[in-house]
């Protein structure tokens, strides 16, 4: 999946990421841009507008939780399926999340990283992260197959 150089670039860069901010923004943007994903978060309260979503404390907290799991996954780039097995089971068997949503969130995360880091998020680094989010999405969807 990733070369040793790509792994080093991804994990090295991740140390600069403010997980709480990026996670909140990524999940918020997912819910705004793909409103059908809101059905999994109806218990989060007011999701009636983009502004309400982006300022919703439960969205922010869950976004951080999602990126905390992503951070843990970065420690296991050679075994993403193993690293995300329990989350895959939860999202498939209990929550019944459409696995396509994992791909969408990964793509949103890459956009948010680019927005936060500008030129420091180089095209090469973007390509590396795209590989990672694709791998994570596939790992999360593994239980569905």
Swiss-Prot record:
<keyword id="KW-0561">Oxygen transport</keyword>
<dbReference type="GO" id="GO:0005833">
    <property type="term" value="C:hemoglobin complex"/>
</dbReference>
<comment type="similarity">
    <text>Belongs to the globin family.</text>
</comment>
<feature type="binding site" description="distal binding residue">
    <location>
        <position position="62"/>
    </location>
    <ligand>
        <name>heme b</name>
    </ligand>
</feature>
<keyword id="KW-0813">Transport</keyword>
<feature type="modified residue" description="N6-acetyllysine">
    <location>
        <position position="58"/>
    </location>
</feature>
<dbReference type="GO" id="GO:0020037">
    <property type="term" value="F:heme binding"/>
</dbReference>
<feature type="modified residue" description="S-nitrosocysteine">
    <location>
        <position position="92"/>
    </location>
</feature>
<dbReference type="GO" id="GO:0031838">
    <property type="term" value="C:haptoglobin-hemoglobin complex"/>
</dbReference>
<comment type="function">
    <text>Involved in oxygen transport from the lung to the various peripheral tissues.</text>
</comment>
<dbReference type="GO" id="GO:0019825">
    <property type="term" value="F:oxygen binding"/>
</dbReference>
<dbReference type="GO" id="GO:0042744">
    <property type="term" value="P:hydrogen peroxide catabolic process"/>
</dbReference>
<dbReference type="InterPro" id="IPR009050">
    <property type="entry name" value="Globin-like_sf"/>
</dbReference>
<dbReference type="GO" id="GO:0031721">
    <property type="term" value="F:hemoglobin alpha binding"/>
</dbReference>
<dbReference type="InterPro" id="IPR050056">
    <property type="entry name" value="Hemoglobin_oxygen_transport"/>
</dbReference>
<dbReference type="GO" id="GO:0046872">
    <property type="term" value="F:metal ion binding"/>
</dbReference>
<feature type="binding site" description="proximal binding residue">
    <location>
        <position position="91"/>
    </location>
    <ligand>
        <name>heme b</name>
    </ligand>
</feature>
<dbReference type="GO" id="GO:0043177">
    <property type="term" value="F:organic acid binding"/>
</dbReference>
<keyword id="KW-0007">Acetylation</keyword>
<keyword id="KW-0349">Heme</keyword>
<dbReference type="Pfam" id="PF00042">
    <property type="entry name" value="Globin"/>
</dbReference>
<dbReference type="GO" id="GO:0031720">
    <property type="term" value="F:haptoglobin binding"/>
</dbReference>
<dbReference type="GO" id="GO:0004601">
    <property type="term" value="F:peroxidase activity"/>
</dbReference>
<keyword id="KW-0702">S-nitrosylation</keyword>
<keyword id="KW-0408">Iron</keyword>
<dbReference type="InterPro" id="IPR000971">
    <property type="entry name" value="Globin"/>
</dbReference>
<feature type="domain" description="Globin">
    <location>
        <begin position="1"/>
        <end position="145"/>
    </location>
</feature>
<comment type="subunit">
    <text>Heterotetramer of two alpha chains and two beta chains.</text>
</comment>
<dbReference type="GO" id="GO:0005344">
    <property type="term" value="F:oxygen carrier activity"/>
</dbReference>
<keyword id="KW-0479">Metal-binding</keyword>
<protein>
    <recommendedName>
        <fullName>Hemoglobin subunit beta</fullName>
    </recommendedName>
</protein>
<feature type="modified residue" description="Phosphothreonine">
    <location>
        <position position="11"/>
    </location>
</feature>
<dbReference type="InterPro" id="IPR002337">
    <property type="entry name" value="Hemoglobin_b"/>
</dbReference>
<feature type="modified residue" description="N6-acetyllysine">
    <location>
        <position position="81"/>
    </location>
</feature>
<keyword id="KW-0597">Phosphoprotein</keyword>
<dbReference type="InterPro" id="IPR012292">
    <property type="entry name" value="Globin/Proto"/>
</dbReference>
<dbReference type="GO" id="GO:0072562">
    <property type="term" value="C:blood microparticle"/>
</dbReference>
């Amino acid at each position: 999946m990733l070369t040793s150089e790509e792994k080093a670039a991804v994990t090295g860069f991740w140390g600069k990421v403010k997980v709480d901010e990026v996670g909140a923004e990524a999940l918020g943007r997912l819910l705004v841009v793909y409103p059908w994903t809101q059905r999994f978060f109806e218990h989060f309260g007011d999701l009636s507008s983009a502004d309400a979503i982006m300022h919703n404390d439960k969205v922010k907290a869950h976004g951080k939780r999602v990126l905390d799991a992503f951070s843990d996954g970065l420690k296991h780039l050679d075994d993403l399926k193993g690293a995300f097995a329990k989350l895959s089971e939860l999202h498939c068997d209990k929550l019944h999340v459409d696995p396509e949503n994992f791909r969408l969130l990964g793509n949103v995360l890459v956009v948010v990283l680019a927005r936060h880091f500008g030129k420091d998020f180089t095209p090469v680094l973007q390509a590396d992260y795209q590989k990672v989010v694709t791998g994570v999405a596939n790992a999360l969807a593994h239980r569905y197959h």
